[in-house]
Amino acid sequence: MALLQRASYLRLYYLRLMGSRPRLFSSSLSPALHRHSSTLSSPPFSSPSPSFRLKFQLTSVLSQRLIQRNAISSRFLSTEASQETTTSKGYSSEQIQVLEGLDPVRKRPGMYIGSTGSRGLHHLVYEILDNAIDEAQAGYASKVDVVLHADGSVSVVDNGRGIPTDLHPATKKSSLETVLTVLHAGGKFGGTSSGYSVSGGLHGVGLSVVNALSEALEVSVWRDGMEHKQNYSRGKPITTLTCRVLPLESKGTKGTSIRFWPDKEVFTTAIEFDHNTIAGRIRELAFLNPKVTISLKKEDDDPEKTQYSEYSFAGGLTEYVSWLNTDKNPIHDVLGFRREINGATVDVALQWCSDAYSDTMLGYANSIRTIDGGTHIEGVKASLTRTLNTLAKKSKTVKEKDISLSGEHVREGLTCIVSVKVPNPEFEGQTKTRLGNPEVRKIVDQSVQEYLTEFLELHPDILESIISKSLNAYKAALAAKRARELVRSKSVLKSSSLPGKLADCSSTDPEVSEIFIVEGDSAGGSAKQGRDRRFQAILPLRGKILNIERKDEAAMYKNEEIQNLILGLGLGVKGEDFKKENLRYHKIIILTDADVDGAHIRTLLLTFFFRYQRALFDAGCIYVGVPPLFKVERGKNAQYCYDDADLKKITSNFPANASYNIQRFKGLGEMMPEQLWETTMNPETRILKQLVVDDIAEANMTFSSLMGARVDVRKELIKNAATRINLQRLDI
């Protein structure tokens, strides 16, 4: 199903362990190459050998939700083991290093930006962008312009106050140079001396980290009718701070411009910023800050290919929820409110949809997405459960005294966004993935309770619809209880409780064990014969599994193939806390045919994993195997090709009068076990795509529109995707 290529919500990492001959790789998703560094360990039960590893990343346009190709690439990894030598090394004061200035950032960049791959590269943009948004949150900026330049640099310009340039009393440098070269120097530490009452920056490291990891950085500041400029390289100033008087017509100009070129010594993969990834973050910020207009421009050497977009959403979070629920059937209009309590601001927007069986809850703190939740999310959940139970009983909507709706029941079908702005946010780490302020939980809880109680008492029809939806979830949970208990009772890792078709591996260590989910008995037979039984298990599926996007929990647990997946993989029960150690295999590999049916089955499986146990993606357990499409035989030599480009490259090297044979593999069952092992299952020669969810909101939208019940939405998706199909690549 070619529509799988639309999975913009997934950041796909392609891993290839190669022998001596480099190849072009791709899959049905056909990404372009892009450098990305990684570490590599020897495959289980095999001796180490020199190898390459490729990581590829693929992201798509969020607005159209269509795939765009992202580049990525490889780095040679030494196989030398870093072991202690027999000679004891001395350990004295001579071995104690003192890193000064920005040296710690360059020494351990991952501590500050997460990684030196694509994610860390984009984090540099977010650091500068967040600074501009902090100016907007403070009420001093209304416009932010982001440009992805053709030379690989990025510039961010805002019309805020401009970074101060006067002499700093402590460092005896200009304030501009101070914030660019000194860690933990900034104006966002709170208190009466802070330059911001609310900000996403806390540690004073964002701008200096970007400077440290940039081959070159140019900064311009417009303040008080003056223009100040300075250039840096790898964290050090290479010019003095210059100053000139602005011409009369530009006297009122104010703001800051940062343009940086990421350092190739740090980002050893190809340095290429993805337009769609950055566009997604910008759209998010525009929803969160309705008074700001953010533009994004991607320059190209060909002017006709230059892209430009503006993002401005006056409706704020209410408009954000409407956008997320575009493909769903809402029960009511979006509910939204804003409260200010004890210096903190709480914004909440929420809406229930009749055709959704899970919730989407997004949390933000000072415009920073807290992907791991926090006290603001906890406050919303607790308040929703308590308030709706109270209102249901008060209104007599729930008549049975023994019924108590749980959080899962009341949140079924809910899309909720909560954004808090607090003077002193307590984030966990520099990456700010979770909010820890205990007082925020109480503020959010109280705000949600007051608003919902007042609104729903005035609108009993909406209350009745929400409670009805929750009661249906409650009844479905009761109907599924027996099946859930069956799953629990069979979850013990005994062969007698495992699916009959599962060909297990001999290893009982989940870290080295992997399972291939294959399509049908034919492919299952070849895979069982071709695998390495020591660490590779095979689970054949019978036809297409249930589309759980359109089914409730009771129907899901009754499905035999779903039960086999849950029991065979050790997934546990939906809704319970995910524990990776309970999995039977830490690599779950989807291996289907390279045709429409194979893509459909792959999509159904991804839907199941996302809805049933989303944490599998976060834990890095979900992979997609890529079998070859062609086998090229010339004489006694045979080569495998994974796409048309690979095929073209190989055949173009043959003489014009060469005689060779091309075999097209329609399915895995056509391959001999030895071929399947060599091309698709051998850890040293295979291609795997590792899937992780990079944007939960976008992922939810994609699954809803692609696999949901609304035909009109799916039809529109197909029409949009059709315009991007390369007709030359269709197998007709």
From Swiss-Prot:
Q: Which reaction does it catalyse?
A: ATP-dependent breakage, passage and rejoining of double-stranded DNA
DNA damage listed as a keyword: no
Q: Where is this site: Interaction with DNA?
A: 544, 547
Q: Name one Pfam family in it.
A: HATPase_c
Q: Where in the cell is it found?
A: Mitochondrion
* Residues involved in Mg(2+) 1 binding: 519, 593
Keywords assigned by UniProt? ATP-binding, DNA-binding, Isomerase, Magnesium, Metal-binding, Mitochondrion, Nucleotide-binding, Topoisomerase, Transit peptide
Gene3D superfamilies (alphabetical): 3.30.230.10, 3.40.50.670, Histidine kinase-like ATPase, C-terminal domain
Q: Which CDD domains match?
A: HATPase_GyrB-like, TopoII_Trans_DNA_gyrase, TOPRIM_TopoIIA_GyrB
Give the co-factor note.
Binds two Mg(2+) per subunit. The magnesium ions form salt bridges with both the protein and the DNA. Can also accept other divalent metal cations, such as Mn(2+) or Ca(2+).
Query: Which cofactors must be present for this protein to function?
Result: Mg(2+); Mn(2+); Ca(2+)
Keyword check for Magnesium: yes
What role does it play?
A type II topoisomerase that negatively supercoils closed circular double-stranded DNA in an ATP-dependent manner.
Q: Can you name this protein?
A: DNA gyrase subunit B, mitochondrial
